[in-house]
Amino acid sequence: MAKDWQDARLGQCHRLEDYSNVAINYTGPYLTPSGTMAYHPGNAPLFTQAPPHTNPQGPPPFPLFNSISPVYDPATGRLLYRNVNTQVSHTAIPNPANGYAAVYGGPPSQLPPPPQPQSHPNVTVISASPARAIEQQPTILSSTDSNIPRPGTVKSSASPFVPNQNPSAPPPPPQEYRQLNVTDALSYLDLVKLQFHQEPEIYNEFLDIMKEFKSQAIETPEVITRVSKLFAGYPNLIQGFNTFLPPGYSIEISSADPGSLAGIHITTPQGPLMINDLGKTTAPPPPHGSTTPLPAAASYTSMNMKQSSASHPVLQPPAPSTLQFNPSPSPAAPSYPPVDASVKQAADLDQAINFVNNVKNRFSHKPEAYNSFLDILKSYQHDQRPIQLVYFQVSQLFAEAPDLLEEFKRFLPDVSVNAPAETQDKSTVVPQESATATPKRSPSATPTSALPPIGKFAPPTTAKAQPAPEKRRGEPAVQTRNHSKRTRTATSSVEETTPRAFNVPIAQNKNPSELEFLEHARQYLANESKYNEFIKLLELYSQEVFDKNALVERCYVFFGSNEHLMNWLKDLVKYNPANPIPVPRPRVDLTQCKSCGPSYRLLPKIELLLPCSGRDDLCWTILNDAWVSFPTLASEDSGFIAHRKNQFEENLHKLEEERYEYDRHIGANMRFIELLQIHADKMLKMSEVEKANWTLPSNLGGKSVSIYHKVIKKVYGKEHAQQIIENLQKNPSVTIPIVLERLKKKDREWRSLQNHWNELWHDIEEKNFYRSLDHQGVSFKSVDKKSTTPKFLISELRNLAQQQKVELSEGKVTPSHQFLFSYKDPNIITDIARLFGVFLIHGSTHSAEDNEKMSNFLRSFLSLFFDVPYDSFIPYLPTHFNEEESDIDSLSSSLIEKPRASSSPIHHANNNGLRLLKDVLKKTYRGARENRSSVKEDYVSESTERTPDASEIDEHISEHEENDDESSSVFSTGEVWVNCKFTDTDGSLLDDGTKLSDRSVYNLFGNMSLYCFFRLFHTLYSRLEEIKNLEQMAYSKQHDVKSNPVAVELGLVRHPSERLGFALPTADTVYEQAIQLCERLMEGEIDQNGFEDALRCLYGIHAFRLYTVEKLVTSIIKQLHSVTTNRRLAQVFMYYEKDRVQRRTSPRQQIMYRIQTETAFGPDENLCCIDWNSQTRQSAIRLMGREDLTMGTLKSDAEKWCYYIGSYIMSSPTEGILPEHVRIPFLRKCLPSDEGNEDDESSSVVKSANAIITSFLESGLALTIPINTVKIRYENGTEDVFARNSEQVYNGPYDKIRDYRQSKWREWLNSDEGWTQGLSKDKVRRIKPCTIESLFNESTLRSGKAERFSENAGVESIGKKGKNLLNESGNGKKLDKGLPPKVNGKSSVTRGNKTNLKARNGRNNDDSSNKINLSEKEKEKESIEDEEKNREGSMSPVAKHASDVEDDHDVAKSTAPDFETSSHRPERSSEKKSPSPVFTSVKQTAENDADNEDDKTDMDDQTEETLDADNTMEEEPSKDDL
């Protein structure tokens, strides 16, 4: 590798062989290199900037280039070339101003003579002759100088600034191209890899580009563009890439800015390309409209195929046999055609492309003909069919277009010789120039054709067939029919990316000033689209479409602000300023002018006082000069958007176009007939000689030429029209009678067809006229479909509520509700019920039972809520929906059920609405009960299941129907935890929330289903109300507007029934007709389109509001079904019915009503309040949060204060206070701890044994809260008494509890703190062996009274201890007297006014049962003697007696039945004990308390008597003993 990068000290060696990798034969001075050069000593890349050098003397240096850029060492002044082992290397001649790297040479005397390339295969030869260099240069174009010609590129032969220039100029001498091999490609790849060794992604992207080109994914222009953008900033790589480009393509780099994309210019055969800063490749648009990418994609393909038949590694267009780099070089260098032949071929290709476009435009209405033409060309190119067969097929295809056939002959080789005899007679002679365009061929070769190429397949050039793969044969046709689908990918065709600015080649344009001007114009315009428009102007000028004055005038738009370019352009076109163009006046700033509406501005007076010679006094009076149109758009970027037409307007426009076309042709034909009739009358007066010499001008003696020519073309066709026109001009005496007769015949035919079409047009016009006026109908349906869904309605409610909260936090005043609806017309509510009834009968998909339930609910609920008489719903909402029952039976049953009318709507609703709501609630509860009972017991009949629930509801509702006292509250006043008085600032009492007052607002609390039902209901109500308000307008339209009598006489005015296909309903009002149409739609008598047309006949463009009435009713019924089948809502409606019938209410009642509703729904259901104001007939809807107040209409501070305190003293949570904001008012450490294991049975036994049975609560505390101090003040003499019921957790057998209590008692009694406390050992020893019989026997007591008197004190102390223990056990006292436990944040004890919640003991009221029976205790002691032998021996008789008394008392107390453990406890009494309920009345509780007190008193008295008797028998103990 080091050998390959040898360095050479130029000028020190005298022999050519001494330069192993460089040979110099140039004797002139050297050129200073510039830019970044790479130095590779020892294979280590180093990048440095070349120092400046000067050329002090000598002629201007001539630069020399190698095909691979040299590597320059600035320190030693050496230039290093890589040894690529090439035979011959030719270089291009760059512009010296570009400053590229040149070869450093020594003095001329030290340079060797030019070597021979054949003798040194490893030497790179650089020619010193400029002429020779020009002849030998390859396709690399590294110069931007316009003075140097660019062989290999196709440029115009005529200057765009000089019209009618002779294109026939002597071509330059032919060029020779060095055959590239695989070594050149690999060397370039190594250079790219070395340049980007630190950026491998760029090298990989370059390889991807080459792979895409090889796979035919992209084409040559795309490759050049992407490589230029990839190597931007590396001019040596871009210049080196020119070596591999096909002829006609080159990349040039501007010397001003070689490192940016703006300095890169790409030249293609189709025109120049520019790469802007954004990386987009732009090019001038095609001059003759848009052309298909098919011929453009093949233009360079055909050129390259004709220029070179051998394979060489240039960027050829992708083909199946073309590779990116061919590893096998050609054995010999190919021969290229001269430049004039290539230019001629390019011209022929342009003509072929234009011909294909003409064929496509001609057969635009017959695409199959155009596709057939392309198939013929493809078959010729692929299958190499004979040219005679091609011509025969094309002649049949173009039978109706002889002009295309004549033009097609120009592309055929020797048609007159090779065509069949029958075709030669019909064809004309091939033009001479087409024959000369075809080069001579050998007899064995296939004739080369100038047919337009299709896709990427060029016409066959050799006789040997080249079959393509099958998958490739169909590809060009698909691309042609689909207009090149590949343009949608990153690849685009040459015609689209590089549109031609000129149709003629520009290779012979040698005017450097023009090219320089175009370059400056491109840089000045910057915008590629503007530059393309400028090129179009130049092309039109070169074609003499307009003169130089018009060109200069139009170019002011592009270069008006650049005086230099305008003067340059005038010099190029030799503009004569004899008729100077007026300087454009500055435009008026209309934004500063006075406005009139959004679209007009008033011009200043200086703009109004302008002379005008063509106006008279009337024009100055009438015409507007002051106001100009200046619409104000929504945005400066957005232009004016025309009104979007609907499909019916489009139909009318098409109809008018067809009608206009008929009228235009008939009118023009009539004018031509009149003109020819005048000439025919004139001709009758002429002699034969005058007729023979008579001619007509081009306008045939009329005022216009185009009108008559169009009529001739319409009647005779375009192929014969010109001949007829010439005959009319040259021989009118013979032609006019024939043509006149033909025109009159056509006039009769066209008028007959017009009459036939008028009938069809009239029908189409009637069907589309009213629909075309309805611009809101289509959009209304789509919007209404989204806005009536439950999801949309619920989200709208929540968004409004959230927005109101935000506004309220900002201090803004917001209403308490989210929606406020008005129901002023009760008749519309009746009409809605009418539509509901029709839909339930004809359109409902629910069962008959559900329909009956919904109908009953609607009758009762609508009358109850909206204060509408119940009788008005009976004719429309049937009570039965059985299939066997007819409508007459249903109506009669409804009338039988009809009650007597009442004058008061509320009273009427109370009588009838309640019964219907009761029926609905019965069915709802019944259905839920049936579902539950069917799972539990299958054998229970259906009747037995329904009867109890229905009777319960009847019983529940009948209780409130009997209550007619308005002052009595339906709901409970609510339990309060404290008695409170509300006082004002002056000490007067305020309302505590229990005062009843008259009301006009009735609340209905519901969930989201009920909310959606009300929203949809009001939507239907509002639309019917809007339609009803249009009654006067619709009535005037039907009766006041009279039809035109002429139109009626001609049959142009038809009755709406004839157009609709059915008769409109007859009614007194138009609104009634609309309701009947809605009924007929739901009944299925008319379809949706007929329904809409009928509404348009009644209301015109305002009828769109009822287009979706059927879908809206369907949505309402769907929500109604979910409401009536919801069991929770059934209970809520029961609460609403109880509140609705009351004319007076209080805030506390409404709070309790809301609490009951929330309880019925549960905590997860969203709550909304729908209230009805009977005075204003308005309904408000508001979303109820947990923190929202029930009464949202409080105004004064006193009302708000009383409302808050009234909610505060209730046992329910205070309204307006969130639960998370409530602070617990006691310490958690004071709560009883539960350290034991709940699963441990012994722990449960302990808890149950220590449980307190009785509970007591007496609430008598009263307080006062003044409004001014907000401090609680308690009333004197009031208090609260509370005893709680402990938690009983054990439900096992009672024996375990008894045993546990006895063991604990005996353990304590025998301890030092028990009965032995304070006694001496002798006393204990004496008392311990005693028994109960010995102690309490009468004889023993009498005889031993004196002896034991001394021990009286000790026994008395023991007796007192036992009495105290018994009292403690009997009274149920316990050491732990903490607060009762909380259940779900609420106390387990409910407070009341002096209410004792003791549980009944269930014992017999007989006093004898409460006394201690010692004999029974002895028996019981003997029965358990075996179980407690050890403990029995250690206990004294007194201890045994005390323990037995305690056990008996505990048993008596614990046998009180409990709702959890009573079933497991044995009955200790001889009489039957019935368990008491959980909650008893005050009277029963008082009786039980009295019994319990008596029992306890008797037990205590008996114990005291026993102990007193014992004390009298014993002696009084001494103080020491005590």
Curated annotation (Swiss-Prot):
Comp. bias intervals (Low complexity): 442-468
Species for this entry: Schizosaccharomyces pombe (strain 972 / ATCC 24843)
Role summary: Has a role in modulating the nuclear import of TF1 virus-like particles. Essential for viability.
Disordered as annotated region, ranges: 139-174, 307-339, 422-504, 928-968, 1343-1522
Gene name in the database record: pst1
Domain PAH: from-to ranges: 178-248, 345-415, 504-576
GO BP annotation list: cell division; negative regulation of transcription by RNA polymerase II; pericentric heterochromatin formation; transcription initiation-coupled chromatin remodeling
Identification of the protein by name: Paired amphipathic helix protein pst1
Listed Polar residues bias regions: 426-441, 1385-1398, 1478-1487
Taxonomic lineage from the root: Eukaryota, Fungi, Dikarya, Ascomycota, Taphrinomycotina
Compositional bias ranges of the Pro residues kind: 328-337
Protein location: Nucleus
Biased composition (Basic and acidic residues): 928-960, 1403-1432, 1461-1474
First-listed, main subcellular location of the protein, grouped into a coarse class: nucleus
Positions of post-translational Phosphoserine modification: 442, 1443
Keyword Transcription regulation on entry: yes
KW Ion transport (keyword) present: no
Acidic residues bias (residue ranges): 1488-1522
Classification via SMART domains: HDAC_interact
Phosphothreonine found at: 446
Molecular function as annotated in GO: transcription corepressor activity
SUPFAM superfamilies xrefs: PAH2 domain
Pfam families linked: PAH, Sin3_corepress, Sin3a_C
Recorded GO CC terms: chromatin; nucleus; pericentric heterochromatin; Rpd3L complex; Rpd3L-Expanded complex; Sin3-type complex
